[in-house]
From Swiss-Prot:
Belongs to the thiamine-phosphate synthase family. Residues 1-10 have a biased composition (Polar residues). Essential for thiamine biosynthesis. Bifunctional enzyme that catalyzes the phosphorylation of hydroxymethylpyrimidine phosphate (HMP-P) to HMP-PP and condenses 4-methyl-5-(beta-hydroxyethyl)thiazole monophosphate (THZ-P) and 2-methyl-4-amino-5-hydroxymethyl pyrimidine pyrophosphate (HMP-PP) to form thiamine monophosphate (TMP). It catalyses: 2-[(2R,5Z)-2-carboxy-4-methylthiazol-5(2H)-ylidene]ethyl phosphate + 4-amino-2-methyl-5-(diphosphooxymethyl)pyrimidine + 2 H(+) = thiamine phosphate + CO2 + diphosphate; 2-(2-carboxy-4-methylthiazol-5-yl)ethyl phosphate + 4-amino-2-methyl-5-(diphosphooxymethyl)pyrimidine + 2 H(+) = thiamine phosphate + CO2 + diphosphate; 4-methyl-5-(2-phosphooxyethyl)-thiazole + 4-amino-2-methyl-5-(diphosphooxymethyl)pyrimidine + H(+) = thiamine phosphate + diphosphate; 4-amino-5-hydroxymethyl-2-methylpyrimidine + ATP = 4-amino-2-methyl-5-(phosphooxymethyl)pyrimidine + ADP + H(+). PANTHER family: HYDROXYMETHYLPYRIMIDINE_PHOSPHOMETHYLPYRIMIDINE KINASE THI20-RELATED (PTHR20858:SF17), PHOSPHOMETHYLPYRIMIDINE KINASE (PTHR20858). 4-amino-2-methyl-5-(diphosphooxymethyl)pyrimidine binds at residues 372-376, 404, 443, 472. Its EC number is 2.5.1.3, 2.7.1.49. It is found in: Plastid, Chloroplast. InterPro entries: Aldolase_TIM (IPR013785), HMP/HMP-P_kinase_dom (IPR004399), PM/HMP-P_kinase-1 (IPR013749), Ribokinase-like (IPR029056), ThiamineP_synth_sf (IPR036206), ThiamineP_synth_TenI (IPR022998), TMP_synthase (IPR034291). Keywords: ATP-binding, Chloroplast, Kinase, Magnesium, Metal-binding, Multifunctional enzyme, Nucleotide-binding, Plastid, Thiamine biosynthesis, Transferase, Transit peptide. One of its GO terms (biological process) is thiamine biosynthetic process. The lineage of its organism: Eukaryota, Viridiplantae, Streptophyta, Embryophyta, Tracheophyta. This is Probable thiamine biosynthetic bifunctional enzyme, chloroplastic. One of its GO terms (cellular component) is chloroplast.
Length: 548
């Protein structure tokens, strides 16, 4: 028998473990430590390296796969990506479905679902788990066991039971385990009215009052928050959701978009909530960002044609087609954004001990649809830093941020636009600097000024003061007659401003003037102890007025 080939050993390497030990023990002593300056440099380099290792907000979706790509894990992954979160997935079922409905369902074995959960949760830092289609009692219990073994920061439960097309996606027997086991672990549960009805034994939900009662009843099952979604209440003029935290009911209103491309809205909303929670948002803020995102996505997708069925998907990545990504596109301004226009005031915020960032955050949480930073007393650097911070908040919320007068600040922080007065740079000059993808507003008091704003390429005009105001010196009051004259003459959307508060905002909108899209408010929001409460109250007044 031939001898075994001798193993080749490089002459500079040890040929055995004992030799290796000898080399280690006989190696020269460590070099002396670096001098203090070098040590300081090394610490700085290490700190810089650590700073570059940014944590990525991570959402794990536990849901079914939609072969048509409109709902399920496909919608979840797209929604999380659109809001800047990483999304991993555990597939609970594989469905054959398209725009016409669901043709077949294959449920993944429970043990393999458990294996998927273990793979992700044991290795990756998951911030939030979001659930979708959980087809059986066993699947729900596997999830509960895994979450007890691997706790996460938050659990968002979308109790998917029936598809948009009406097909059953979960056994009726899962209702009890949802109520008795899963909901108690949830930070928020997001049923639509049909799902809420099933969870409560088939009760009828036809009004907002019914939705409130349902939210309160579901809350008793143990979740920290409940969001009952009213998008399926087609007889309603708007899409109203009811949010309940165990103490307070909050109605969240959105415009109803006329489109058939609504497949996956529930999955998307829950995934957006999960993404914002993973980024550290409060629950109410996360819900508002999610609702704004879905409304905007539906608006941008309303005319898309995908498939031949009645329930089409919508474009989660619509922002890639909007400024600043597409420089040649037209402005993305929508007149309805003027509905509740919050204008900040540094003096008022200082009076109440708020930063500009805190004021903007509070206004958005209360329901402001657009925000203008008007900071007359701030130094440029201070103003810019505040504007950048506010821009992050507004961008994540889908609420436009405009800068008053300061085009340089708007450019530096990439704000959504600028508002200028009659003594400032013209709208035409501002457009030359900002480009076609930004919003430009102009203060106007006369039909001639409104016409000039139109000629200069403005997007809207602010008209006032409608009432006497202390925020602007030597500002003449136009009254209802002056407002009416400008609105009738204007070819642009109009927002009323000047002395508007909770006692008179309704009367302004009740005028029913053409092109009047909303009110701009300063003191009534920011010269108060609670910006959130005042903004919410103002939003309610305006919403109720617009319904009449």
């Amino acid at each position: 028998m031939a001898a075994a080939p001798q193993q080749s050993v490089h002459p500079s390497l040890p040929s055995s473990t004992s030799t290796l030990r000898l080399l280690i023990s006989s190696s020269p002593r460590r070099p002396p430590p670096p001098p203090p300056r070098a040590r300081r440099y090394n610490r700085l380099a290490a700190s810089a390296s650590a700073a570059r290792e940014m944590p990525w907000p991570h959402v794990l979706t536990v849901a079914g796969s939609d072969s048509g790509g409109g709902a399920g894990i496909q919608a979840d992954i797209k929604a999380c990506a659109a809001l800047g979160a990483y999304c991993s997935s555990v597939v609970t079922a594989v469905t054959a479905q398209n725009t016409a409905g669901v043709q077949g369902i294959h449920v993944v074995p429970e043990e393999f679902i458990r294996e998927q959960l273990n793979s992700v949760l044991s290795d990756m830092s998951v911030d939030v788990v979001k659930t979708g289609m959980l087809p059986s009692i066993g699947v729900v219990r596997v999830l509960c066991e895994s979450l007890k073994k691997f706790p996460v920061k938050a659990l968002v439960v979308d109790p998917v039971m029936v598809s948009t097309s009406g097909d059953t996606l979960s056994e009726s027997s899962t209702l009890s385990v949802y109520r008795d086991e899963l909901f108690a672990m949830a930070d928020i549960v997001t049923p639509n009215v049909k799902e809420a009805s099933r969870l409560l034994g088939g009760v009828s939900l036809r009004t907002v009052s019914d939705m409130r009662n349902a939210a309160e009843s579901i809350y008793k099952f143990g979740p920290k928050h409940v969001l009952v979604k009213g998008g399926d209440m087609l007889e309603s003029s708007d899409a109203t959701d009811v949010f309940f935290d165990g103490k307070e009911f909050i109605e969240l209103h959105a415009h109803r978009i006329k489109t058939h491309n609504t497949h996956g809205t529930g999955c998307t909303l829950a995934s957006c909530i999960a993404s914002e929670l993973a980024k550290g948002a409060t629950m109410l803020h996360a819900v508002q960002v999610a609702k704004n995102f879905v409304e905007s996505a539906l608006h941008h997708s309303k005319d898309l044609v995908v498939g031949n069925g009645p329930q089409g998907p919508f474009d989660h990545l619509f922002k890639l087609k909007c400024p600043p990504y597409n420089v040649g596109s037209q402005p993305s301004f929508k007149p309805d954004q003027l509905f509740l226009y919050a204008v900040t005031d540094s003096g008022m915020n200082k009076k109440w001990g708020r930063s500009i960032k805190e004021a903007v955050q509070a206004a958005i949480e209360g329901g402001a649809t657009i925000v203008q930073l008007r900071e007359k007393d701030s130094e440029t650097r201070e103003f810019l830093e505040a504007a950048k911070a506010c821009m992050e908040i507004c961008k994540s919320s889908g609420v436009p941020l405009l800068i008053n007068d300061r085009v340089d600040i708007a450019l530096a922080c990439n704000a959504d636009g600028v508002h200028v007065g009659q003594l400032d740079m013209s709208a035409h000059e501002v457009r030359e600097l900002l480009g076609p993808g930004k919003i430009i507003g102009v203060s106007c008091k006369t039909p001639a000024q409104a016409q000039q704003a139109w000629n200069d390429g403005a997007d809207y005009i602010g008209c006032g003061g409608v009432f006497p105001t202390s925020t602007k010196a030597n500002n003449p009051t136009l009254g209802f007659d002056g407002l009416k004259t400008v609105c009738l003459a204007s070819k642009l959307p109009v927002v009323a401003i000047g002395g508007i508060n909770a006692s008179n905002a309704g009367s302004v909108m009740e005028l029913g003037l053409p092109n009047l899209k909303g009110v701009a408010v300063v003191s009534a929001l920011f010269d108060r102890p609670s910006v959130v409460a005042e903004t919410r109250n103002m939003k309610s007044i305006l919403t109720n007025t617009s319904r009449t």
